[in-house]
Amino acid sequence: MGVHFNICLLLLLVATISSQTLKATEKDDSTDENPFGIYRRGSQCAVYGGRCIPTSVRCPPNTFQCDLSGCSWSERCCCHL
């Protein structure tokens, strides 16, 4: 009786581990979504051809800092000349 119980527990453990492994290998679609990127595409900065650049980096050549909304608090909008 004890051996039969141990075998049942072992099978239950193997089945649980197998099902968890299958769940882990499924693709998680939520990681592909970038809601901030989607928001920025419709922002004033993007509509006028600007790009959101980190505040620690200077605007690229042939661009200037413009005061348009749509960038996060740690970024600024750089517009083309």
UniProtKB/Swiss-Prot annotation:
It comes from the Eukaryota. One of its GO terms (cellular component) is nematocyst. GO terms for molecular function: toxin activity. The keyword Magnesium does not apply. The basic myotoxic domain of rattlesnake crotamine toxins (with 6 Cys residues) has been detected in this protein. However, this protein contains 2 additional Cys at the C-terminal region. Hence, this protein may contain 4 disulfide bonds instead of the 3 suggested by the myotoxin domain. Residues 20-39 form a propeptide. It is found in: Secreted; Nematocyst. Keywords: Cleavage on pair of basic residues, Disulfide bond, Nematocyst, Neurotoxin, Secreted, Signal, Toxin. Residues 1-19 form the signal peptide. Its main location: secreted. Induces neurotoxic symptoms on zebrafish. Has also been claimed to be implied in calcification, but tests on homolog proteins suggest that proteins of this family have a neurotoxic function and not a calcification function. Belongs to the Cnidaria small cysteine-rich protein (SCRiP) family. alpha subfamily. This is Small cysteine-rich protein 1 1.
